[in-house]
């Protein structure tokens, strides 16, 4: 079949006939994901996630399929939706659905469907019964967590969803109001048993920290993003490979010789700059932080403002996690055929709403020409959403093994040791677990560790088996 499955089924995918293709790619990915496979082997007998009901909101890719099957192998019950309307790989969703996991993810789904699916991943049991909702959330960007918090507030006071400031907020607020009209205590009940959330990305961590600081975070949280084996690998090395993959698949453009502007020089920006420089682009960087700006300059990149670069650069990449990084006045000033894309989590880094009034011409899915009144056109990729997942398939399996090993370990930590973590607080995994994730991946790349002697360990004041660095160490 090639149509979306019937709405009454406990899933929403594009095409179940893609399951065999998805399964073949999952098998390939498993060979490149040694961390997850080692965790399965270590914990399968103990079933540490038995009894866990995990609501998952994370890009429904082949690599995520391996994560889902790892969580299930450790005993968890899982319901899953994508955290981005363009990031789903439909054959991955089909393979997971064919295995019996409720999946709600279709590449190119509408925002209305997106929020409907995000609601549906909380429906574990019958209304008013124990186990009605999840007891764990695995989040990427914080939308599932946001939904529970905003929904509970709206149950008490609908005015909190009365004044949307964007089209996405309008759709989200409408979905919340409709749910409350249908079931006035749905959000309170669905979140009643949640032990905690593990958060994948920088943007979601910002949301968690804000709620924790205000005293409004309802449950425990582990910040997976700031594990070294996530942020210094997924964010940097993953983006270093997947950014250019997305740009190339979308445009077939020659990178060499072009001026490429990277907005932001954090871990993601560093990886993007390295990738573009490796293909011999002239890389320019914008930054607000003097330390990051100096780092970029010391790497040989020209540090400029967006106003300076707008009419000069050929390729623009936003990586900041902030909003309005590329605004209307910048796009008006750009060259004809400038390429504009984003690799930050949300679509508000580029002010796409400000150019919706102009004529759009779809070149192919997720590649649009925006034609200005003077006839100039820019090429906008993935409508300002994640270019590496909208126009390609995201990060390679190996680096996602490192990220998802952290996610799995974090889920085990929160679920099995809830008393060790205080509700309303945000934690990072202990360094010993961070080092464990790294160890699980060394053999695959042929790396051999040097072992300290007793005397050496005593001299520098560490245990022979680690951890080897202070928590304040900057890798």
Curated annotation (Swiss-Prot):
It catalyses: S-adenosyl-L-homocysteine + H2O = L-homocysteine + adenosine. Its main location: cytoplasm. SUPFAM superfamilies: Formate/glycerate dehydrogenase catalytic domain-like, NAD(P)-binding Rossmann-fold domains. One of its GO terms (cellular component) is cytosol. Substrate binds at residues 61, 140, 200, 230, 234. InterPro entries: Adenosylhomocyst_ase-like_sf (IPR042172), Adenosylhomocysteinase-like (IPR000043), Ado_hCys_hydrolase_NAD-bd (IPR015878), NAD(P)-bd_dom_sf (IPR036291), S-Ado-L-homoCys_hydrolase_CS (IPR020082). One of its GO terms (molecular function) is adenosylhomocysteinase activity. Keywords: Cytoplasm, Hydrolase, NAD, One-carbon metabolism. It holds the Pfam family AdoHcyase. GO terms for biological process: L-homocysteine biosynthetic process; one-carbon metabolic process; S-adenosylmethionine cycle. The keyword Hydrolase applies. It comes from the Bacteria. It is found in: Cytoplasm. Gene3D superfamilies: Adenosylhomocysteinase-like (3.40.50.1480), NAD(P)-binding Rossmann-like Domain (3.40.50.720). Pathway: Amino-acid biosynthesis; L-homocysteine biosynthesis; L-homocysteine from S-adenosyl-L-homocysteine: step 1/1. NAD(+) binds at residues 201-203, 235, 264-269, 287, 322, 343-345, 388. Binds 1 NAD(+) per subunit. Its EC number is 3.13.2.1. Its cofactor is NAD(+). Belongs to the adenosylhomocysteinase family. May play a key role in the regulation of the intracellular concentration of adenosylhomocysteine. This is Adenosylhomocysteinase. It comes from Paracidovorax citrulli (strain AAC00-1) (Acidovorax citrulli). The gene is ahcY.
């Amino acid at each position: 079949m090639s149509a979306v499955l019937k709405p009454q089924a406990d899933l929403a995918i594009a095409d179940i006939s893609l399951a065999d293709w998805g399964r073949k790619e999952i098998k390939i990915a498993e060979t490149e994901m040694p961390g997850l496979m080692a965790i399965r082997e270590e914990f399968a007998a103990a079933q540490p996630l038995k009894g866990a009901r995990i609501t998952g909101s994370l890009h429904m890719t082949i690599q995520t399929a391996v994560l889902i099957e790892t969580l299930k192998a450790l005993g968890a019950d899982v319901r899953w939706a994508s955290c981005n309307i363009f990031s789903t790989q439909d054959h991955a969703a089909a393979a997971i659905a064919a295995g019996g996991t409720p999946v709600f993810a279709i590449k190119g789904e509408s925002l209305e469907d997106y929020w409907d699916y995000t609601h549906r991943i909380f429906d574990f049991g019958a209304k008013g019964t124990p186990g009605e909702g999840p007891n764990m959330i695995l989040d990427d960007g914080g939308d599932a967590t946001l939904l529970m918090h905003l929904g509970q507030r709206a149950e008490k006071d609908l005015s909190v969803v009365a004044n949307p400031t964007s089209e996405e907020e309008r759709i989200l607020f409408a979905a919340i109001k409709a749910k409350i009209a249908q079931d006035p205590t749905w959000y309170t009940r669905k979140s009643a048993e949640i032990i905690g959330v593990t958060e994948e990305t920088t943007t979601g961590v910002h949301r968690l920290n804000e709620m924790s600081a205000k005293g409004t975070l309802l449950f425990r949280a582990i910040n997976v993003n700031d594990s070294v084996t996530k942020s210094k690998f997924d964010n940097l090395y993953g983006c270093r490979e997947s950014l250019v993959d997305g740009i190339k698949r979308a445009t077939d453009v020659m990178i060499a010789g072009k001026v490429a502007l990277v907005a932001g020089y954090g871990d993601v920006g560093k990886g993007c700059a390295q990738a573009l420089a490796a293909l011999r682009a002239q890389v320019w960087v914008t930054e607000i932080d003097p330390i990051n700006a100096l780092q970029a300059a010391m790497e040989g990149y020209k540090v400029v403002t967006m106003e300076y670069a707008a009419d000069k650069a050929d390729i623009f990449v936003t990586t900041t996690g902030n909003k309005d990084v590329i605004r209307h006045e910048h796009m008006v000033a750009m060259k004809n055929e400038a390429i504009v894309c984003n690799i930050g989590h949300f679509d508000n880094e580029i002010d796409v709403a400000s150019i919706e009034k102009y004529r759009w011409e779809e070149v192919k899915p997720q590649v649009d020409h925006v034609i200005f009144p003077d006839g100039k056109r820019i090429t906008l990729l993935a409508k300002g959403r994640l270019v590496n997942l909208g126009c390609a398939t995201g990060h390679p399996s190996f680096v996602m093994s490192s990220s998802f090993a952290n996610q799995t370990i974090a889920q085990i930590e929160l679920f099995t040791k809830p008393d060790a973590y205080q509700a309303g607080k945000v934690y990072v995994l202990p360094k010993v677990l961070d080092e464990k994730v790294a160890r699980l991946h060394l053999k695959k790349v042929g790396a051999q560790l040097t072992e300290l002697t007793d005397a050496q360990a005593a001299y520098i004041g560490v245990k022979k088996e680690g951890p080897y660095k202070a928590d304040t160490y900057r890798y």
